[in-house]
Amino acid sequence: MFEEMILEKVRKEAERIAEEQGLEIFDVQYRRESRGWVLRIIIDNPVGYVSVRDCELFSREMERFLDREDFIEHSYTLEVSSPGLDRPLRGPRDYVRFTGKLAKIVTKDGKTFIGRIESFVDGTITISDEKRKYEINIDDVKRANLEVEF
């Protein structure tokens, strides 16, 4: 089965399982790596953080589906994880959800901003550091992620 077809079938079932468990799918990847084929499913909790138990329960259900359907022709490793503490920010919903959190935003023109997300309104992200506030149009963002705080 082609990789795109595998991804489509896995994503559909992953979304069903995630919805049942009150989770969301952040990403699904299927690719060959140095140790062989890896099916990586990254889950998210829309109202908090992903626990080890969340990963365990999701993984069990996904394994049942994969064993039952048996549509992946070669051996692979299933990995289920969270987006991580330094998770990428993907779109308006994330900027609203993580208001108050420390983030790093790199714009398409190469500027880097590190500060707390203050708000997201009408396509504009407001982020501030100790010295000043910055307003960044979401269309100008090349990449963004949360910064780990200690």
From Swiss-Prot:
* Its job: Required for maturation of 30S ribosomal subunits.
GO biological process terms, alphabetically, are: ribosomal small subunit assembly; translation
- Entry-linked NCBIfam families: PRK14638.1 (NF011231)
Q: Which InterPro entries match?
A: Ribosome_maturation_RimP, RimP_C, RimP_C_sf, RimP_N, RimP_N_sf
Report if keyword Cytoplasm is assigned. yes
Name the family the entry cites: Belongs to the RimP family.
Q: Which organism is it from?
A: Thermotoga maritima (strain ATCC 43589 / DSM 3109 / JCM 10099 / NBRC 100826 / MSB8)
Where in the cell? Cytoplasm
Does the record carry Protein transport as a key word? Answer: no
> CDD domains per the record?
YlxS_C
Record protein name field:
Ribosome maturation factor RimP
| GO cellular component terms, A-Z | cytosol
Q: Which PANTHER family match?
A: RIBOSOME MATURATION FACTOR RIMP
Alphabetized, the UniProt keywords read: Cytoplasm, Ribosome biogenesis
* One Pfam family cited in the UniProt record for this chain: RimP_N
Mind telling me which Gene3D superfamilies this protein's record contains? Ribosome maturation factor RimP, C-terminal domain, RimP-like superfamily, N-terminal
